[in-house]
């Protein structure tokens, strides 16, 4: 669909820019030193640094380690756990147990998987598609925030899941909220702040949600893709809307419904978007 193709184009664009950047750096490293060396030699100045320059020097590819700053290891013991998750936000310890996971797609659909763990400084983004069907060693600590986007399900499997340490609380909200086409509404003003499943009642589109702090400063904007023609993309689960969050539905054919999510981690909704 449009979302998948756009994600693929963005991914290819990022890869293309990275390749161009690397090529430019290589050219600069290989060409500039000899030119400067000749210039300095012609002016009578010594250029010992460039005379000793090693053209055969190789640069190791940098590999990002998302777990470089963790302060504790996950327990090797635990329960065997496997669950399929559709698109939405999931809090580790509330919606999914702590553990070391293998995340698998179906080999056809495109997914984006994001893990943000402020306490352990883990920030991970992975694409799961026909090329990358499986992502291994996904370490999810209690309190981490996991986001899934795409059509279908991602399967999360672990052999050390800490199911006995999970905790949650029922959502205090009980009433749904309708948002019509080309309508904008504010949490805390037009409807109660809280945690909702954003559902496409009819149509398809990409509503955007802007989050503000208590001073009115914009923190982030979240862009969703939902469609009533898909069993999994018709809902984005566990969308946290703190006081002042603005949801803008600018699509003329999209009707939305905010349905209170079943369970939540906390009523401190703004903390999901802030850093201590």
Mark where each language-model region is.
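Extended, well-structured beta-strand/loop surface patches
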Residues: 51-107, 112-276
């Amino acid at each position: 669909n449009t979302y998948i193709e756009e994600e693929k184009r963005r991914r290819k664009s990022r890869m293309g820019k990275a390749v161009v950047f690397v090529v430019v750096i290589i050219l600069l490293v290989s060409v500039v030193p000899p030119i400067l060396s000749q210039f300095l030699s012609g002016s009578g100045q010594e250029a010992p640094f460039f005379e000793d320059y090693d053209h055969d020097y190789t640069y190791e590819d940098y590999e990002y380690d998302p777990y470089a700053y963790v302060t504790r290891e996950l327990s090797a013991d635990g329960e065997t756990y496997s669950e399929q998750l559709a698109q939405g936000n999931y809090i580790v310890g509330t919606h999914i147990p702590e553990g070391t996971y293998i995340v698998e797609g179906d080999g056809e659909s495109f997914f984006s998987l994001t893990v943000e763990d402020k306490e352990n400084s883990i920030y991970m983004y992975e694409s799961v598609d026909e090329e990358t069907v499986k992502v291994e060693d996904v370490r999810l600590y209690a309190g981490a925030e996991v986001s899934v986007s795409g059509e279908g399900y991602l399967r999360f499997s672990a052999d050390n899941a800490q199911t006995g340490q999970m905790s949650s609380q029922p959502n205090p909200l009980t009433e749904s909220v309708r948002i019509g086409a080309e309508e904008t509404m504010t949490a805390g003003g037009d409807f109660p702040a809280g945690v909702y499943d954003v559902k496409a009642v009819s149509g398809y589109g990409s509503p955007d949600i802007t989050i503000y702090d208590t001073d009115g400063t914009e923190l982030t904007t979240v862009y969703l893709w939902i469609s009533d023609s898909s069993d999994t993309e018709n809902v984005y689960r566990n969308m946290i809307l703190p006081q002042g969050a603005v949801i803008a539905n600018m699509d003329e054919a999209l009707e939305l419904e905010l349905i209170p999510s079943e369970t939540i981690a906390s009523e401190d909704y703004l903390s999901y978007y802030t850093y201590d």
